[in-house]
Amino acid sequence: RWFTNFIERGEEFEYIGLSYYPFWHGSLDQLEFNMNDIAKRFNKDIIIAEVSMGFTMDSYQEYEKLADSERKGYATKPELVEKIDYPMTIEGQADFTKDFLNRVANVVDDHGKGFFWWEPAWIPVHGSGWATPASLKYMNDPGPCGNEWANQALFDYDGNVLPALEVIRDFRK
C-alpha cells in the first residue's frame, strides 16, 4: 500500500529498491515473485538495494582481536542457516549468487536493473564494520563491537577473492 498511496498523492519515482537476505526474507522463488509482482503492478524498475549470502560459519574472532563479550557475532545466526536453500560454503555462495543474478535479470519487462552487495569488503580486521568502538561512541551505543558481516563478504577472511565475485564479474544477461 505504501507505493500505491505514494502514487495516489502524485509523487514520482523511477526505481523501487528491495532488501533481500535469504536468512531473513525467504527463498529466491519468493523474491522472484515479489519482484515480478511489483514490476507489473507499478511498472517500475527494481534494484536489490542490499543482498548477501555467507560463505562460511567459521569463526573470525582471531582476526577481530575482540573478546567474546565485545563481539557482535554473525548477522546470520546459526539457527537462521537452516532457513537458507544454499549451504554456507564458498560453493554455496557462488551458486546462490548465480541464481540470484539470473532472477534479477529475468524480472518481467526487463525491470530488473541491478543490486548492491552488503557488504562486499568487510573482512574481519580490527576496526572493520559499522560497530567499531569509535562509531559506537559517536552513536552513544553501548555495543558490542565487531563486524557481523565478515562471513558474507566477497573476500575470505584473509582478503582473497571468492568465486562469488567472479560470478558477478562474468555474469551476462
What residue ranges belong to the model's regions?
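Aromatic-rich peripheral "rim/lid" segments of glycoside hydrolase catalytic domains that contact
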Residues: F33, D37-K40, T56-D99, R103-H111, ...
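Noncatalytic carbohydrate-binding groove/subsite architecture in carbohydrate-active enzymes
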Residues: R1-T76
